UniProtKB/Swiss-Prot annotation:
Recorded name of the encoding gene: odcI
Native organism: Lactobacillus sp. (strain 30a)
Protein name, as recorded: Inducible ornithine decarboxylase
Keyword Lyase in annotation: yes
Record keywords, A-Z: Decarboxylase, Lyase, Pyridoxal phosphate
PROSITE patterns membership: OKR_DC_1 (PS00703)
Entry's induction text: By ornithine.
Coiled-coil regions listed: none
Length: 731
């Protein structure tokens, strides 16, 4: 396997070795593409910089006096080239080349290493995929453009499992299982499964392995639609819902502290199944969002302590996190770092959507299983059973580059180097928040305003990256406006860069006279080349990963400050939102930016939008269950459905779940009756589409028809008359 690693050398040290490799200047290098560093012994800045990466790069120090090198520097040096003795540039070259090869061998994880070796062999293919290394694409102009756009390597790495050299990804053997075992060690799991198809596929795998028809499932109402669909609609689990928070800004909060009370949970379970509610462990599975889309992250140790004894298994859906165990102050949020699990505790499953904020191609995810402490018990799900479900959803034609991305991700998180990546990110984003707070007044980072008697922005950055006090949701604090949080229950995920926009009084949580709805901010940023993750009401979210740099964050801050100035000056809308204005000039002709802000803010205010959004996830306002989600799914498959307009849908049983996307959380689940609250909320969305073209959200499970000059929303509901007269199922 040929190596592409370079050698980083200072100018003075370059004369003391020969090499056929590319040599780059060690000064200013980030050392990610080099296999060795060569410097004079007194060039300690270079030696220290290489050591600070924690990559373990071999450093060669050239010296005329080996005795003069300090003990501290010796710890950072791999080998000394001693000029006191007669040096031989060729010998030095061999030593350096050996070190580079050994280093590369150590940094490449098992599957990716094997994939590189396999591709380098240039085998003649007569198997799948049909493009056979990209050669088919090269025979047509469109195909050639496609081939050239992605580059040769990705096509040559798109392989078929007809050759078992890389191991079978479905039965977990060879380099494939070696990669999963390596990831399990990195993440502190008993077993790890690499999943293609996103965390939706991972959730399908977990729930189909654990939930059978009729099982009780303790269910976080914030769960992603994939969990509703797989655990309830497909597997037949019966939900016991836990109510969750929304605040006036539109941020998604965690489960109410009171809902973790055992007595209350058993009372809720008794309404679904009085007998099972009395069992030692009423629930086959609990599914909890470890971190919400909007950065409320749980103390996982407390969750297990409070509800673990009621459940055979707990699945922590960690789609929006996964990095918590690599950040010291977040360790308590990692279910995989609970080290005192015993036979009475639940099995732990953690699903991670690696592609969201870790290093993975889109659709890469992984399942971590930590349940050896219940091995031998009837509730234990062994590998055979779990892999049976894995194979139900895993393609027999996996995309090997995606699998390799999961392998490389684990390598990147490992050890000191991985922890440093996340620490450096924290420093970058803390500094960015400070700059925005000090330079602007309109868009406020969603963090505590005061910590330990000092303004948040006046804290010491290094301390803030290690002290959870700066991120804690204090019980009852006005700044976050979440109700029902307990002491030390939740904190802000520091890797969610969340901003609030004007329009909500932070003291009362009420609407103010003027506001800037976040969708306006999001559209402005997109017009200026910056893509946020999502926005809702008066909140906007940016996902932070180790990809961020100070320059990148400064570009974001600059555009936010520019928008603030434009709003303060009441600039023409045509100047502020050119794309939306051009597409809807008849509607917005002559508008200024403040006029649009005012109209949209008043629309949300007059409809009391955040109140209805909040109620959707409160037990008092949960839709009544008309049939089980599994039954609703069966009725929909049988075509026992009818399309009903929103203004006539209240009380009808939904056969499809309805939700805005993002965040992908059902407001009405399959089998639930459309409630007054749900109808009102989706009516607000419908009216927003009609009144403010260009700002339409993506909505799933609700269908829109153009009727005259208006868009009208419809939903698929149960048609009892059709079901009654369907002779296929009434014999």
């Amino acid at each position: 396997m040929s190596s592409s690693l370079k050698i980083a050398s200072t100018q003075e040290a370059r004369q003391y070795f020969d090499t056929d490799r590319v040599v780059v200047d060690a000064v200013g290098s980030d050392f990610t593409d080099v296999g060795a560093v060569i410097a004079m012994d007194y060039e300690t800045d270079v030696i220290d910089a290489a050591d600070a990466t924690k990559f373990g790069i071999p450093v060669f120090a050239v010296t005329k006096d080996a005795q003069a090198i300090s003990a501290d520097e010796l710890k950072k040096i791999f080998h000394i080239i001693d000029l006191e003795n007669k040096f031989d540039a060729t010998v030095n070259a061999r030593e350096i080349e050996t070190a580079v090869n050994n280093y590369e061998d150590s940094i490449l994880p098992p599957f990716f290493k094997s994939l590189k070796e396999y591709v380098s062999r240039g085998l003649i293919q007569f198997d799948c995929p049909g493009h056979q290394g990209g050669q088919y694409y090269r025979k047509h102009p469109a195909g050639r453009e496609f081939y050239d756009f992605f580059g040769e390597t990705v096509f040559r790495a798109d392989l078929c499992n007809a050759d078992v050299a890389l191991g079978d990804l479905l039965i977990h053997e060879g380099p494939a299982v070696a990669a999963e075992k390596h990831a399990a060690r990195v993440y502190n799991a008993d077993k790890t499964y690499f999943v293609l198809g996103g965390s939706s596929n991972a959730n399908n795998t977990v729930t189909s392995a654990l939930v059978s028809n009729g099982d009780l499932v303790l269910f976080d109402r914030n769960n992603h639609k994939s969990v509703y669909n797989s655990a309830l609609a497909m597997a037949g689990g019966r939900p016991v819902y836990l109510q969750t928070n929304r605040n006036p800004y539109g941020f998604i909060g965690g489960i109410y502290d009171s809902d973790f009370d055992e007595k209350k949970i058993r009372e809720l379970a008794a309404k679904v199944d009085p007998e099972r509610a009395k069992w030692k462990r009423p629930f086959r599975l609990a599914v909890i969002q470890l971190g919400t889309y909007d950065g409320t992250i749980y103390n996982a140790h407390e969750v297990v302590k409070r509800i673990g004894h009621l459940c055979d298994y707990i699945e922590f859906d960690s789609a929006w996190v996964g990095y918590e165990q690599f950040i010291p102050m977040m360790r308590n949020s990692s279910p995989l770092l609970i080290d005192d699990l015993g036979p009475e505790d639940p099995g732990i499953i953690v699903v991670q959507s690696v592609h969201k904020q870790q290093a993975g191609f889109s659709q890469t995810s992984q399942i971590h299983k930590k349940d050896s402490h219940i091995k031998g018990q009837l509730r234990y799900c062994d590998h055979k059973h779990f892999n049976n479900s894995f194979n139900l959803f895993m393609s027999t034609s996996p995309f090997y580059p995606m699998y390799a991305a999961l392998d490389v991700n684990a390598a990147m998180q490992e050890g000191e180097a991985g922890r440093k990546l996340w620490h450096d990110l924290l420093i970058t984003t803390i500094e960015a928040r400070k700059k925005l707070i000090k330079a602007g007044s309109m868009f406020r980072p969603f963090v505590p305003p005061v910590v330990n008697g000092k303004k948040w922005e006046d804290g010491d950055t290094e301390d803030m990256a290690n002290n959870i006090d700066y991120w804690r949701f204090e019980k009852g604090a006005k700044w976050h406006a979440y109700e029902g949080y307990g002491d030390n229950q939740y904190y802000v995920d520091p890797n969610k860069f969340m901003l609030t926009t004007p329009g909500i009084n932070p003291e009362t949580g009420d609407y103010e006279d003027f506001g800037v709805p976040a969708t306006i901010v999001a559209n402005y940023l997109r017009d200026h080349g910056i893509i946020p993750e999502k926005s809702d009401l008066n909140s906007i979210l940016f996902l932070m990963t180790p990809a961020e740099t100070p320059a990148k964050m400064n570009n974001l801050i600059t555009q936010l400050l520019q928008l603030q100035r434009l709003i303060e000056e009441d600039a023409p809308l045509k100047q502020v939102l050119p794309s939306i204005y051009a597409a809807n000039e008849e509607r917005y002709n002559g508008y200024t930016i403040r006029e649009l802000c005012q109209e949209l803010h008043d629309f949300y205010k007059n409809n009391n939008t955040f109140t209805y959004q909040k109620r959707l996830f409160l037990r008092e306002f949960f839709p009544e269950q008309g049939m089980l989600p599994y039954e609703a799914r069966q009725e929909f498959i049988r075509n026992h459905n009818k399309l009903v307009p929103l203004n006539k849908i209240e009380g009808e049983i939904a056969l499809e779940g309805a939700l805005p996307y993002p965040p992908g959380v059902f407001c009405v689940a399959p089998g639930e009756k459309w409630s007054e609250t749900a109808v009102k909320y989706f009516t607000i969305l419908q009216d927003g589409i009609n009144n403010f073209p260009g700002f339409a959200p993506e909505i799933q499970g609700v269908y829109f028809k153009q009727e005259g000059d208006k868009v009208v929303a419809y939903g698929e509901v149960y048609d009892a008359e059709v079901a009654k007269n369907d002779d296929r199922y009434n014999n």
